[in-house]
Amino acid sequence: MSMTERVRKLRQASLDAEETLSSERAELLTAFYWQEPGPVSAPVRRALAFRYLLEHKAISIGEGELIVGEKGPAPKNAPTYPELCCHSLEDLDLLNSREKISFKVSPETRQVYEQTIIPFWQGKSLRDLLFREMTDEWQAAYEAGIFTEFMEQRAPGHTVLDDKIYHRGMLDFIAEIETRLEALDFLHDLGAYSKQEELRAMRIAAEAIVGFSERYAEEARQQAKKVADPKRRSELKQIAEVCSQVPAHAPRNFWEALQAYWFVHLGVTIELNTWDSFCPGHLDRHLTPFYRQGLEEGTLNREQAEELLQCFWIKFNNQPAPPKVGVTAAESGTYTDFAQINLGGILEDGSDGVSEVTYLLLDVIEEMRLLQPSSSIQVSKKNPDRFIQRAARIIRTGFGQPSAFNADLIVQELVRMGKTMEDARSGGSSGCVEVGAFGKEAYILTGYFNLPKVLEITLHNGRDPRSGKQIGLETGDPTGFQSFEELFAAFEKQLLYFLDIKVRGNQVIERLYATFMPAPFLSLLINDCIARGRDYHDGGARYNSSYVQGVGLGSITDILTALNYHIYDRKSMTMAQMLSMIEVDFVGFERERQKLLNKTPKYGNDDDYADGIMRRVFEAYFNALDGRKNTRGGEYRINLLPTTCHIYFGSVTGATPDGRKAWTPLSEGISPVQGADRHGPTAVLQSASKMDHARTGGTLLNQKFTPQLLADDAGLEGLVQLIRTYFILDGHHIQFNVVDVATLRLAQKHPEEYRDLIVRVAGYSDYFCDLSEALQNEIIARTEHGTF
């Protein structure tokens, strides 16, 4: 089935809509806090604010819509969250005027900010408090580009829904909360009062989302009275019935299941601007019972289900990521908000998770060709090749979706972190490549960590050469190091020092969110927040992980390899000579630079010399971070991914001993340095598989193929076997760009002719013409493979 006329119109309207900054949420929230509900606890205050938002925000049902609800007043209207980050007038002007990832800011919106929102929130936002609480050491490292902080402009909440909302309605949650409240023991439980307030807040939040859906039901009823077309009148009456049923009660059919999720998604992302966006998780397995039931009863056919899913897809595409500025915009410069749908994998009993709904969803992904939602295939040894082949046919269209994950390895990763086997099998990937136990875990991404920058500071005895400031430890003049072991030991000391600073900061930030910014609606959706009477931000979830995302693994590997190979092994140059060359960005030393680029072992070529150093960096990073306790009762873990932060981190890192020029991008994910992999994709997979992916919470590997390679069935089968091979080698994730360099260069020169060109950036797809020039050039520079 292709798109119906309804879907074509809705899809085009979504694509044509302009990303606009909406002041609606900020105005309503400010009005609520002006009123101040009296002496109530922080969780209850946040729940009352949530209720106020849902009672007063504008609602609308667009022409032809079957799935209803928007975060803002209209599609592509992005709300703001001044309690977290209050944008200045300068921020608004920048958002309105910048060339890429801009948001239209109307004069009326700017005036509201100037007269109402900024005067109330300036100095009071959590971002203001966060920066006030950070140490001088943290500030220096942050400003130098050692790390970023995810929670300075967006809330934690990187989590995924399980199947509970498909079996239970909000009234069931409220009944459970009432039971927990009645059972509180104030005589013997010293935390009873805190639990009471959190449970009361969850109850208010659950009631609020029911009221919100009823507003939509009433809107549909009113529209039905006015519309002349009998078919649309019937649809609106059905929408009213759906919205009266869910999410108050459990969904009874396929349509209600989709609408139930969408109301929950809106609730989570209206409450706070969770990073990454809330995700549906294993949508195929959640929808399969409703699909089969509809077919058996004769109330649903495949075409109807497909149209509903297509309408569902459009709702995701209508929601741009919240406006970002500063470092946060640099580390994640995209409209995409990373809501990922998992397909396939294995069920909780360990059996094959592929169903007829899996293939239906793959058809929808190919037909819709939208950036959001993101999609992934979860590949298990138990899945049929037909499943991967179907996904491969989509990949070869050059859409960048779906990405591929090793479902069997993800289970190992989660079990290693302490999850039960059942919870691990119900987990998967979200955001870019991060893993968690769906519906049961708060796995917070804390920010990116610049591995090559730490080495750069090591090579300057703790000084940042960009600013001239001493921000690290004095680990010794590297010209005096007699061996690679001395150099690596100095790097490990700096690495531990900066990770200590990063973790200390995040311990404080976690408490700030737990204390001042509870999330009662998100909390009631995640086990075991109700049972514990604790907020999602305060360790209420069954599992609570904190991730730090390492960036530039390929770059730091090649840098250390060059130092070891040329200075300590071959002795073809001295450390002093190397430092002199990078200090002047290789000006006057192009011959030596070409030697570093072309006559040095490189990661990504199945070369044990370079790959062995990669393993040492991996082990150093893992040992310095993994297993540290966070404040929520969980532990810190590593993962390796960049979003767009390898561009930002490169812009603050000078020339490096691998031949890289100053201020240019670092390598992305666990991919080799751009252009350094010269022995084909199989060699890349061999190199990447030499790290222990099972000890991470996610690794990201990009590959770029020519369209000609995948043009026939033999090419498709080669891609299927490449994915299978990498996962046999225990790789975590792989994704593909299928586009040639010539097309990308033409798109740079004539963007108006290539507005629909989509590429895979990091853990997401984006329009090539929406990317910064630096990011466009980085994607062009990635090695293009014409053979397997």
Question: Each predicted region: which residue ranges?
Answer:
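Extended non-globular scaffold/tether segments
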Residues: 200-211
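A conserved hydrophobic secondary-structure block that centers on an alpha-helix together
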Residues: 223-232
